[in-house]
A protein has these predicted regions:
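Glycine-rich, small/acidic residue-mixed loop/short-helix segments
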Residues: 110
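One face of beta-strands
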Residues: 14, 113-117, 131
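Predominantly the C-terminal beta-signal and adjacent terminal strand-loop region
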Residues: 122-164
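Short glycine-rich, acidic/polar surface loops and turns
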Residues: 76-80, 114-121
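C-terminal outer-membrane beta-barrel translocator/porin domains of Gram-negative envelope proteins
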Residues: 1-89, 94, 101-103, 144, ...
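Short small-residue beta-strand/loop micro-motif enriched in glycine and branched aliphatics
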Residues: 100-103, 128-130
Length: 164
């Protein structure tokens, strides 16, 4: 069993962490995660999709797999700040936008924005492992909680609370 399909894809990712002036504890985190099919037809389950990156972080504000196509562009900005003086608790505010190419034309016609906020609790200051709880909103309607831990300690879970 297997596939005779011949296809190629390329993942282009960029991350930047910018300390904000007048505060050594606040950071602006930028993330660009772009996945392109260069040739052939990939199997459906291997297509780029919302929330299908290594740690299920893309597409906050949407159910995993809500969007899927041959090509994906994802951009995110997250403001990270301390809530408690000792660093046990911190918070985040984030915005993101993702677009998937039309399967036939290959054009990017729809941009799906997302936004949210979250709280972090530090589990281990040496490994910088945090428990994270985010609440995110998306369009079409979509919103819900995302629980996760940095450093892959827990698997991400999006609990959808959409309403029509």
């Amino acid at each position: 069993m297997g596939s005779d399909a011949n296809w190629q894809s390329h993942l282009v990712e960029f991350r930047a962490y910018i300390p904000l002036p007048n505060s050594n504890q606040n950071i602006l985190a930028l993330w660009s995660h772009n996945w392109f099919t260069l040739g052939g037809t990939p199997p459906y389950l291997l297509l780029p999709s919302a929330g299908w990156d290594e740690f299920s972080n893309t597409g906050r504000g949407y159910i995993q797999g809500k969007f899927k196509s041959n090509n994906m562009i994802y951009q995110e900005a997250e403001y990270r700040f301390r809530v408690s003086a000792n660093g046990l608790f911190s918070g985040v505010v984030f915005v993101n936008a993702e677009s998937f190419s039309d399967p036939v034309s290959g054009k990017y016609e729809v941009i799906s924005p997302g936004a949210g906020l979250g709280i972090r609790m530090k589990l281990n200051k040496f490994s910088r492992t945090n428990i994270a709880i985010d609440y995110a909103w998306g369009t079409q309607p979509s919103k819900g909680f995302l629980r996760k831990s940095w450093r892959g300690f827990l698997k991400s879970v999006f609990i959808n609370s959409t309403s029509n």
